[in-house]
């Protein structure tokens, strides 16, 4: 983000995009990337891991995941100051972030649990016990080795301008 936050960095990014523009298939809906792969229209894609997992586990597509260089986000819980329902909100947060509950959730969809303590408890896919869900989690130590955390502050400060510039580039 340090380099992308400079004009030189933005110019370098767009210069790189210029070199691949004619070879990129842009998608707009999450169902598109697995279909583009299945149809042979693309040889690789960026997408949500749950979509690719579904194609692998339920549609038996011969896809794989590469976590190296993944970009990940964080989700947060917030209780507004002065909330009349503070105790209920705290109860919900305790319930929804329970270590075992998060591990159980991972048997349905491979979205990494927010507690590291859940990772050793992750089992198999709810409808196919031969599928070890840990192999599909983005939050294992191996998967996170070269990951980049999305910088919310950077995008709050620069997102609008970069999106406008990207859309103008895309239109040309």
Residue ranges of model-derived segments:
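Non-transmembrane alpha-helical segments in soluble domains
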Residues: 14-18, 34, 38, 46, ...
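Mature extracytoplasmic/periplasmic domains
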Residues: 80-146
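Periplasmic-binding protein-like
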Residues: 15-19, 59-83, 126-129
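Ligand-binding pocket segment of bilobal, Venus flytrap-like solute-binding proteins
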Residues: 1-64
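Solvent-exposed loop/turn segments at secondary-structure junctions
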Residues: 50-53, 70-72, 84, 100
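Soluble non-cytosolic domains of exported or imported proteins
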Residues: 7-11, 28-31, 83-87, 99, ...
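Sec/Tat-exported extracytoplasmic proteins
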Residues: 20-24, 41, 56-59, 96-100, ...
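Conserved C-terminal helix/tail region of periplasmic/extracytoplasmic solute-binding proteins
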Residues: 35, 140-172
């Amino acid at each position: 983000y340090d380099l992308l936050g400079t004009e030189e960095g933005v110019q370098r990014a767009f210069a790189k995009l210029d070199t691949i523009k004619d070879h990129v298939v842009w998608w707009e809906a999450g169902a598109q990337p697995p279909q583009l792969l299945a149809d042979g229209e693309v040889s690789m894609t960026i997408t949500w891991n749950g979509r690719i997992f579904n194609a692998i586990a339920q549609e038996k597509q011969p896809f794989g995941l590469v976590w190296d260089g993944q970009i990940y986000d964080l989700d947060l819980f917030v209780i507004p100051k002065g909330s009349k329902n503070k105790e209920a909100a705290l109860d919900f947060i305790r319930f929804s972030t329970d270590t075992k509950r998060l591990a159980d959730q991972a048997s349905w969809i491979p979205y990494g649990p927010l507690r590291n303590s859940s990772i050793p408890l992750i089992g198999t896919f709810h409808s196919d016990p031969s599928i070890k869900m840990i192999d599909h989690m983005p939050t294992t130590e191996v998967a996170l080795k070269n990951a980049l955390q999305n910088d919310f502050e950077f995008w709050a400060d620069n997102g609008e301008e970069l999106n406008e510039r990207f859309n103008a580039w895309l239109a040309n």
